[in-house]
C-alpha cells in the first residue's frame, strides 16, 4: 500500500470508539479493594490459630502452658545444678543424653499441640440441605410430635457391622472411628480423646506424636529423678545428707516434681501402648465397643491380629493430609460488570458485515443476499415490462457479490404516498423457507436507533420497507423466487 494511502486508515483505526469506556449511558462499577481473608479467620470450630493459620490449637490452652512450665523448669534446674556435678564425678554422657531426651520431648509436644488432629470439614449449606432431604425421605415425614429414629447408617468392615452416626453440628455422617469433640466443636477422624495437657485433640494425624511425647516424657522424668537422687546420695556420702541438701536445694524441688508426676506419666504410656498393640482408641476402649464381654462375635475389625503389625501401622504408617484448607483464601462474591448496551458494538458489527461484498467475500448472511437480490429489481423496476415481471428465471437478477451496488435508488412514480396510503397491514415481510434456510428482510437486522445516515444502505432498506407494497405483490414474489434459485445454486 502506498504511504499516502495508509494515513487515513490509521486515523480511522485510532479514532474508533472504545466499547469498554464509560459513557453517559453507563454507570461505571467502582470496585472497592477488600483485603482477602484466610479461611482460618472464618473457621466455624472453637480453635485458635497462630502464625497465619499454620498453628492450630484448642481454645483452652491454660493447662498446656502449665505443661510447658513444668517441663522447662524441671529440666532447667537439672541442667543448671545437677548435670555439672554429674559430668565431673560420674560421666559426661549424662548431660548429653538428658539434652537429647529434652529436645525430643519438646519437639513431640509442640508437634502434637500445633498440628491438625484430623478435623473433618463441615458440610456446605447445599450439601447439608441435600443430606437432610435424603434423611427425611428415608425416615418419612414426622407428624403429631413423632420424632424419627436416630440418624444412623450401617457399614460392614471386615465382617463386623459398624454404625455411622449423623452429626447435627457438622451436618455429616461421621466416618468409622470418628467422633465430635465438644470442647473444640469439631468432628475428628479416628478421635482418641481431648487432652488439655497438650492443648489439642488427639486424633488420626497427631496420635503418633502424642504417644512419642508421653513415652519420651516418661523416660525423661525417670532419667531426671534417678540422677537427682544419685547426685544427692553422692554428696551426702562426702558431707552428710543435710549438707548435701543445702549445697543443692534445687535437687529437692526436682525430686518432688518427678516423684508425683512419674507415676501418672508411666501409667499413661503403658495404657496407650496397650491401645496401640490392639489398634484401639481411648474413645473405643471407654465405650467398650470391642469388649469381649459382649460375646465372641464382637471383635475389633481394625486390628491386624498381630501386635507388631498394629504398632507399625500406628507409628510408622503414612500421615494422611489435612482435610481443611486453613491458609486458603475466602472467595468473595464479586459482581460481574454489565456489558455496554449503548448500541455502539452492535452498530460496528453491522457495519463490518456490510463491507463483505466490497472485499469479494462470497460467504454472506441471508439478509445481505436478500438485499443484493431485491435492490437491483427496485432500481430497474420502471423499465421492466409486465412480461418480464412474471419471469422467475430471468438472469437479470445478477449475483450478490459481483453486481451489488448500494447506491441511493429513486422510488418509482407508481408507488403510493406513505403519508396517505401506507398502513401496517400493507407491510408484507419477505420470508420464505427453502432447504432449511429462512430468508429475512434487510430491516430485520438489528441496528441502533438514530445512528444511521440518510445515505447508508441500511437506511435505504428501511425506507424501502416503509413504501406501500400492496400494489407490488408480484414484484416481491418474483424477488423471492429469484432468491430461492440463487440460494439453491
UniProtKB/Swiss-Prot annotation:
PROSITE patterns: DHHC. Its EC number is 2.3.1.225. It holds the Pfam family DHHC. It is found in: Endoplasmic reticulum membrane; Golgi apparatus membrane. Residues 1-60, 111-208, 277-489 are cytoplasmic. One of its GO terms (biological process) is peptidyl-L-cysteine S-palmitoylation. It catalyses: L-cysteinyl-[protein] + hexadecanoyl-CoA = S-hexadecanoyl-L-cysteinyl-[protein] + CoA. GO terms for cellular component: endoplasmic reticulum membrane; Golgi membrane. It is a multi-pass membrane protein. The active site is at 195 (s-palmitoyl cysteine intermediate). The keyword Transferase applies. InterPro entries: Palmitoyltrfase_DHHC, PFA4/ZDH16/20/ERF2-like. Residues 434-454 are annotated as: Disordered. Residues 165-215 form the DHHC domain. The chain crosses the membrane at residues 61-81, 90-110, 209-229, 256-276. The DHHC domain is required for palmitoyltransferase activity. Palmitoyltransferase that could catalyze the addition of palmitate onto various protein substrates. May have a palmitoyltransferase activity toward the beta-2 adrenergic receptor/ADRB2 and thereby regulate G protein-coupled receptor signaling. May play a role in cell differentiation and apoptosis. This is Palmitoyltransferase ZDHHC14. It comes from Mus musculus.
